[in-house]
């Protein structure tokens, strides 16, 4: 047992030495480089998708030239490198560090935009990849956080070159948030929890009026009222459905769980 432990310890020590050796090698190679050369080399690595190497060079640059404009830009570029390398948590941490250190930086609009992108592009679920359905299957927390990041960008920097794309992504995220609520409403209807389903449907109608889920929400709300023994409310809801969606299929047949795609049952 002692021999095994010694072998494991030796292996870990050698691994640590190898990592330290790589860092020391980078430091040694670049020791006489100017800030411009360091930054250019880091950019070359970034553009070549060598993200780990790029981050190392950005860190060396920042440690040697902490007050330079290249150091500040390197902090943003580090966040971007992490984003491209699918290191979401590290990217978000780098962005927050930049925002904390440089709240008035002229590239703050980009920092907000990048934060939104990191959250917006969070990995989709297995069902999303399998069925290629809408984003309502994503984590609603990620949807809200991405929306808030883009909204802050648009509000603070309406003339930013990133504002138009951020706005377009916000539209998609609002639709996704409505879809999150719809998924829950469908689930409650299937389980016979009609009060909870009605509350979710009302939330969609009130908060997500410009999404594609309003029509189905009205159909669910009408049926929920019927099941709850509230015929007047059901009739009122049906009139709203008729007025706003005169060609709705829910006018000829009530909402049914069978109307849902197969993968909705997996929620």
Swiss-Prot record:
Gene3D superfamilies: Tetratricopeptide repeat domain
Lipid moiety-binding residues (S-diacylglycerol cysteine): 17
Key words, A-Z: Cell outer membrane, Competence, Lipoprotein, Membrane, Palmitate, Signal
Entry membrane topology: Lipid-anchor
Database matches in InterPro entries: BamD (IPR017689), BamD-like (IPR039565), TPR-like_helical_dom_sf (IPR011990)
Signal peptide segment: 1-16
Protein family: Belongs to the BamD family.
Protein name: Outer membrane protein assembly factor BamD
Species this chain originates from: Neisseria meningitidis serogroup A / serotype 4A (strain DSM 15465 / Z2491)
Source species taxonomy: Bacteria, Pseudomonadati, Pseudomonadota, Betaproteobacteria, Neisseriales
């Amino acid at each position: 047992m002692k021999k095994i432990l010694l072998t494991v310890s030796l292996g870990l020590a050698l691994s640590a030495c190898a990592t330290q050796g790589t860092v020391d090698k980078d430091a040694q190679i670049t020791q006489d480089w100017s800030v411009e050369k360091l930054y250019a080399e880091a950019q070359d690595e970034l553009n070549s998708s060598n993200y780990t190497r790029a981050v190392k060079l950005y860190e060396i640059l920042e440690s040697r030239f902490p007050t330079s404009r290249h150091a500040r830009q390197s902090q943003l570029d580090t966040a971007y490198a992490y984003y491209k390398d699918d290191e979401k948590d590290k990217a978000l941490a780098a962005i927050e560090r930049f925002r904390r250190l440089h709240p008035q930086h002229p590239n703050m609009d980009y920092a907000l935009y990048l934060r939104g992108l990191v959250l917006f592009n969070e990995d989709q679920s297995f069902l999303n990849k399998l069925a290629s359905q809408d984003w309502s299957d994503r984590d609603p927390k990620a949807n809200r956080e991405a929306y808030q990041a883009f909204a802050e960008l648009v509000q603070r920097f309406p003339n930013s070159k990133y504002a138009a794309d951020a706005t377009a992504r916000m539209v998609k995220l609002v639709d996704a948030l409505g879809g999150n609520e719809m998924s829950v409403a469908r689930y409650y209807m299937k389980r016979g929890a009609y009060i909870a389903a009605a509350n979710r449907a009302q939330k969609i109608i009130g908060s997500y009026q410009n999404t594609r889920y309003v029509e189905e929400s009205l159909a669910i709300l009408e049926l929920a009222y019927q099941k709850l023994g509230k015929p007047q409310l059901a009739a009122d809801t049906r009139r709203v459905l008729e007025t706003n969606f005169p060609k709705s299929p829910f006018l000829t047949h009530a909402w049914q769980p069978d109307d849902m795609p197969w993968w909705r049952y997996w929620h």
